[in-house]
From Swiss-Prot:
This is Mitochondrial substrate carrier family protein B. Residues 1-141, 225-244, 315-338, 424-434 are mitochondrial intermembrane. Residues 1-37 are annotated as: Disordered. Residues 1-35 have a biased composition (Low complexity). Keywords: Calcium, Membrane, Metal-binding, Mitochondrion, Mitochondrion inner membrane, Repeat, Transmembrane, Transmembrane helix, Transport. It is a multi-pass membrane protein. The gene is mcfB. Pfam families: EF-hand_7, Mito_carr. Its main location: mitochondrion. Ca(2+) 2 binds at D90, N92, N94, R96, E101. Solcar repeats lie at residues 136-229, 239-325, 333-422.
Amino acid sequence: MSNNNNNNNNNNNNNNNNNNNNNNNNNNDKNNNNNIDSSIKEKKLKEWFDKFDVDKDGSLDSNELKKGFKLHANIDMKDEQITKMMERADSNKNHRIEWDEFLKVASDSSSPEIEDIAEHWLQYSTKPIVHAPADVPSWKLLLSGGVAGAVSRTCTSPLERLKILNQVGHMNLEQNAPKYKGRGIIQSLKTMYTTEGFIGFFKGNGTNVIRIAPYSAIQFLSYEKYKNFLLNNNDQTHLTTYENLFVGGAAGVTSLLCTYPLDLIRSRLTVQVFGNKYNGIADTCKMIIREEGVAGLYKGLFASALGVAPYVAINFTTYENLKKTFIPKDTTPTVVQSLTFGAISGATAQTLTYPIDLIRRRLQVQGIGGKDILYNGTFDAFRKIIRDEGVLGLYNGMIPCYLKVIPAISISFCVYEVMKKILKIDSKKISYQS
């Protein structure tokens, strides 16, 4: 009985082996057929190429292409169609289509018949080409953006500091510190000068400049990388509004995560008026880690992400939509237009995200000098600010912020344009809208 079972098993194994062999043979046959079909198709395409090549010089000019389609397919191509077909297929830009260029285009047609080749080539020639900004060396873009950001932040440092002091003024972080809340812009700046001298206008700015260079670089590169990923994968020439919002938000969060400790240190140095608790970036970092742990360097990170992501998203999207609405296709905006669009987009983004920015600052600076912790997280801060200060409390320091955003954007764009000229960067290659 066992011998019979063994024989049956052997027979089954043999059958399985035979089936596997048959499958392998079938796969080999398919591969061979594909190779044969490809070879036959290429041979047929070469015949068509030779028929079109009337002067037998191994390449086709626009006249040969037009006459060939008319003679062999009875298709009367317009001159502009032939021009587009030539431009798309002519990879070496010699105004002629050589055999390898013809094969590259025609091999993707549904069949080697001339009618199908013509239809495919026409569709291929009108298919959008996505020009990635990678043509410009990354270091040029990073340098231009970094210098522009540093100069603009330095020029608007007094208003930036005034904004932060208004945001956190009620927290009484230092005894005898002057009150800025409720004062006018001019009076507040006078108080700052009287109390701290000219240097008071720029407290925390060194940290801000050090932070803004990598922040701008990472944000710019992240935006371009995410944008090009969507464009290349979806075969698009520009992003939709929703895609721009997503890409801008992702770029904002990426840059924030990489530079957040510097932003927090900058806030601590900025709100310091009389005291010398913190002496520079390194000392501030050491003291925060010693008193609050490493986690102290990331206080308010969640609130910051909630504010930065929509801010950058709205900023980029508003700017792109303004360009799309008012700038003719295939042209770049003038300096004045760029300044105007940038100011509008920055003001729009700031208005919509300012409450989150205010909460972020308060979370970053609470606990300084052993002061009480007022807020237990983002949502607790939001609730208590409305309860204690009203809805308008979410907008403390808004006017100085507006006055800072517009010149900051303007200066940034102006310096950026100068840097592009110095570094000979072609504006068309780095347009956000490819």
